[in-house]
Amino acid sequence: MAEDRLNEYVQKMKVADGMLIGSPVYFGNMTAQTKAFLDRAFYVARANGDMFRLKVGAAVAVNRRAGALDTFNEINKLYLISQMIVPGSSYWNTITALKPGDIATDEEGVRTMRTLGKNMAWLLKKLG
């Protein structure tokens, strides 16, 4: 059986000022692995005094066609119910790709990610 490293990752999330969590989109939503990880990590955080409260969190979704906004929204729901602060960008934090390297062809998606990075860095600096 594989070693469960959830507690290790939760501790890293606990000490981080912010987190950027993303998922590829499979069958219209985040992957099962991402969903399982997030449900477990955020349950632990909530059960331990809302340990992610007031941290900065950004969601990113990579899709081929549909489901990016569903994935984006599901991650943001976890941030918001955990009392986290979510920075915005110039568009939804999604990027379109089918295979490795394809993201470079989504110019709007790349611009959105750059803006998100700048906005997240600005917010972290202001809160720090």
What residue spans do the PLM features occupy?
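Glycine-rich phosphate/pyrophosphate-binding loop and the adjoining helix
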Residues: 2-8, 15, 81, 85-128
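Helix-loop-strand module that forms the ligand-binding subsite of alpha/beta enzymes
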Residues: 1-85, 90-91
